[in-house]
Amino acid sequence: MDKRIFILALAAFTVGSVELVIAGILDMIARDLRVSVGVAGQLVSVYSLVFALGSPVLIALTTKVERRRLLVIAMLVFTAGNIMSMLSPNFTMLLLSRVILAASCSIVVVLSITLASGIVTPEAKGRAIGMIFMGISGALVLGVPLGTLIGEAWGWRATFAFIGVLSFIVTICIMKFLPQAASPPKLPMREQLRTLGNSKIVFAHLVSILQMTGQFTIYAYITPFLQTMLNLSPGQISFVLLVYGLAGIAGGWIGGWAADRFGAARTMIVTLLLHAVAILLL
């Protein structure tokens, strides 16, 4: 594997961990900051909203910034956001830190995908992008269970401290090993909005919105659900999250390989059909 792709996947893993680990420590945060689990769930809602709305806006506003430099800045802001989360004295401050984390994370994810696809040959783009998504899925396998265990051992603040240290290490690797990448030609916002007139693009956005909404609606409250409804122990819950993450990693690799082999359209159709079958089996 190209070490540059690995570093970008590691960056995706790091930011994915802070996005997803909240599910494993939500009940700890609620108890410590004296809010209900429902109120604590706003940490997920606000994060998702800022990520979705901030990503296109921030990328558009930073088109003149060299891509590696922008990635480094985003990672440093992400590190600062973790420090802020760790030191938050109340829920309001923690919620504000989630805004900072989501904004920086949105830039890191987009840049990781675009830089990875630009590093490899056209024939390997699908696998390179798949590796980035494997990094995000890897956050489910290692980041979430490990972050949950750290939270149970030393408190939820230690979880953010761990991710902050990891993100700083990744930032150093980006500065050392990734080459500079020219900024893409600036596309006016009006031209970008015109793409919404394309029914195929709108449908693709709709599929992504529905899929992510369904995924994070259940995932945000998976720990309290497994505790109260199925009476699972912390160890059993970590195992459930591990299986979920392993499936995500396998899907990222298979999806990237299938896109290169059979084309993106066919791969998407088969994937959506499998989703439909899984829902029917429920």
Annotate each predicted stretch with a short phrase.
Residues R4-V37, S55-L58, I218-T223:
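Extracytoplasmic
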Residues R34, E66, L87-M93, N231, ...:
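Helix-breaking motifs and short loop linkers at transmembrane-helix boundaries and internal kinks
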Residues L53-T92:
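Conserved MFS/SLC helix-loop-helix module at the cytosolic interface between two early adjacent transmembrane helices
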Residues S55-E66, G251-G263:
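Helix-to-loop junctions at the C-terminal end of transmembrane segments
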Residues L70-I83, R266-L280:
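Structural signature of the two symmetry-related core transmembrane helices
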Residues M93, P122, G130-K176, Y221, ...:
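Helix-loop-helix hairpin linking two adjacent transmembrane segments in secondary transporters
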Residues S97-G135:
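Cytoplasmic helix-loop-helix junction between adjacent transmembrane helices
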Residues V202-L242:
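Extracytoplasmic gate region of multi-pass secondary transporters
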